[in-house]
Amino acid sequence: MEFFNILQSACNDVNLDFNDKKYNQFISYKNLIQEWNKKINLTAIVEDEEIIKKHFIDCIKIFKSSPIGEAKSLIDIGTGAGFPGIPIKILKEDIEITLLDSLQKRINFLNIVIGELQLKNIQCLHGRAEDYAQEIQHRQKYDIAVSRAVANLAVLSEFCIPFVEKGGYFIAMKGPSVEEEITAATKSIEILGGKIEDIMKIDIEDTDLKHNLVIIKKVRETGKRYPRKPGIIKKNPLK
């Protein structure tokens, strides 16, 4: 129970219940990350305490954003090792979650995690966001889209906003210096039907990490031409 108090404190900070079951799920998840990271590249963060603080607690902080607490469905785009989708699912069992990633090896890992943690109402998709966002069963179908991926905000917005239904939210988990990104992305967010509603500064206790949650509300439907074809988005971000 070495890390129980650390995780419980983080949950208390965002008004979430925490118990032994959730703790054991987090520890099993940590162990799977460490085991699989020897086979495939999941994360450069591999020590116990660093995984707890720099991955898990960072993801828990997304609950500071009120839309997450009310959401019934969520898609995590470019989820990688399952961040933030798996921690969200552990803490909010009633939400339906889709994890999307372009690398099959990571999807294989995530399916193992889902089975080992006995998570329900969660699915994995292998492929590109640009393709799935044009499919009727995914386009404008989710209350929330989230991403912790490293792409700039203009690019992330075109990947993510098309998945969100009108009235829903895209939440981008960004680093400490986000002002220039926001300035550069404001026009693209507007084109895609979004509007920046809030920017929340996040501190991760006992670390030097300072992050921002960029909360974007979907105020209009996304035009049919977006997202554009694979490859174009990164080469030529909307301006």
From Swiss-Prot:
Gene source species: Clostridium botulinum (strain 657 / Type Ba4)
Phylogenetic lineage: Bacteria, Bacillati, Bacillota, Clostridia, Eubacteriales
Enzyme Commission identifier(s): 2.1.1.-
GO molecular function: rRNA (guanine-N7-)-methyltransferase activity
Gene3D superfamilies per record: Vaccinia Virus protein VP39 (3.40.50.150)
Protein name according to UniProt: Ribosomal RNA small subunit methyltransferase G
Coiled coil residues, start to end: none
Primary localisation category: cytoplasm
CDD domains reported for this sequence: AdoMet_MTases (cd02440)
Cellular localization per UniProt: Cytoplasm
Family assignment from sequence similarity: Belongs to the methyltransferase superfamily. RNA methyltransferase RsmG family.
Keyword Transmembrane attributed: no
Source taxon at top rank: Bacteria
Binding site for S-adenosyl-L-methionine: G78, F83, A129, E130, R148
Signal peptide per UniProt: none
Alphabetical UniProt keywords: Cytoplasm, Methyltransferase, rRNA processing, S-adenosyl-L-methionine, Transferase
